[in-house]
């Protein structure tokens, strides 16, 4: 089993594919017993995306390198013990392959706020995403995998995909995702939800278009574009009971928040203001851990290549599903659409997401301008 002990690095060193049908119930009715769990998923999802984008779009100077090097925690190499891997992407001479990040939001029950702490059976993942930076560094694609997806977990048979982290930590999770998708994972990130309200406030809040008047964190807001602070954004993503499509509408809200944060980072002057950038990076990096192979040098190389990426170049999607079901042992599960999923996975594996979207125009539903 891969050693996942904590190490400190050297300073040098869109839109979901919403399936038709009823909302996906929480596994074993967990949400009824743990009311705070679902809103954490939103925070973790956004944090993972922002982590990749910020590390890949900042013109990283020496002071940023120092901040990242001293603040980011690392996992020991989770790829070292893997004997079976998805194939490397084939590229033409002179071209660069896409870079794929597996981003997890950990439901940490051991050491709150420390995403590197893992023990067998102690925690599962609340959010699972593959974030791909295209080989030409012009596009970012974010594919979410429902945590209750019923899949083959190597050595454990059929199980929910989020159980892989509980069974075998980062290494087994990578192996499970690669086996399911055929997508070669290059780097691994685990994020926690601590300090996320502060992160939202660091960028001056986020603008969300509300479809209806709402009361968020005790403030009555009209329909239309509204600037939300951290507390209000949190309340916005926690709501579920009053939404007509339940969890699926909540997914829309989560992804709207993701896009709003990214847009605000690019438009608010955060990236050009050293003081604000340092504060923002500190908030992001204090709630995440990466594999030790993701060095600051690689982050800097990624930064140079992604300097022209903007929020319009980021696409959000969810693995196609085929409805919900119950497992033989009574768990509430999500069945994946094998045929539709295979096409999407192939597009990611071959760095052809743009071509996939052009040839399958109805497969990805763009995030609406206004969200419930």
Where are these regions (language model features)?
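N-terminal post-signal-peptidase region of extra-cytosolic proteins
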Residues: 82-90, 106-120, 124-129, 163-180, ...
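C-terminal solvent-exposed extensions
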Residues: 86, 228, 289-372
């Amino acid at each position: 089993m891969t050693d996942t002990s904590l190490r400190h690095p050297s300073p040098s060193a869109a839109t979901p594919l919403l399936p038709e049908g009823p909302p996906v119930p929480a596994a074993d009715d967990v949400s009824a017993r743990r009311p705070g769990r679902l809103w954490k998923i939103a925070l973790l999802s956004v944090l993972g995306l922002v982590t990749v984008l910020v590390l890949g779009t900042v013109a990283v100077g020496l002071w940023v390198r120092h901040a990242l090097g001293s603040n980011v925690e690392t996992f020991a190499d989770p790829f070292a013990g893997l004997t079976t891997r998805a194939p490397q992407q084939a590229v033409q001479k002179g071209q660069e392959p896409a870079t794929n990040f597996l981003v997890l939001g950990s439901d940490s029950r051991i050491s709150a706020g420390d995403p590197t702490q893992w023990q067998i059976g102690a925690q599962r993942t609340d959010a699972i995403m593959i974030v791909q930076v295209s080989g030409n560094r012009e596009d970012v694609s974010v594919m979410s995998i429902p945590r209750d997806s019923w899949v083959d977990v190597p050595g454990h048979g059929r199980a929910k995909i989020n159980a892989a982290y509980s069974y075998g930590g980062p290494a087994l999770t990578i192996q499970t995702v690669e086996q399911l998708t055929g997508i070669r994972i290059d780097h691994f990130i685990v994020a926690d939800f601590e300090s996320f309200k502060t992160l939202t406030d660091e960028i001056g809040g986020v603008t969300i278009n509300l479809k209806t008047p709402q009361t968020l964190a005790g403030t009555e807001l009209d329909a239309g574009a509204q600037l939300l602070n951290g507390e209000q954004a949190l309340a916005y993503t926690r709501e579920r009971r009053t939404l007509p499509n339940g969890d699926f509408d909540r997914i829309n809200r989560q992804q709207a928040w993701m896009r709003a944060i990214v847009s605000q980072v690019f438009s608010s002057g955060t990236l050009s203001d050293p003081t604000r950038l340092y504060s923002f990076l500190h908030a992001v990096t204090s709630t995440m851990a990466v594999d030790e192979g993701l060095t600051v040098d690689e982050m800097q190389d990624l930064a140079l290549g992604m300097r022209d990426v903007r929020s319009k170049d980021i696409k959000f999607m969810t693995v196609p599903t085929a409805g919900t079901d119950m497992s033989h042992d009574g768990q509430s599960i999500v069945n994946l659409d094998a045929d539709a999923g295979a096409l999407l996975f192939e597009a990611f594996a071959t760095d052809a997401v743009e071509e996939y979207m052009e040839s399958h125009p109805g497969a990805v539903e763009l995030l609406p301008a206004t969200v419930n």
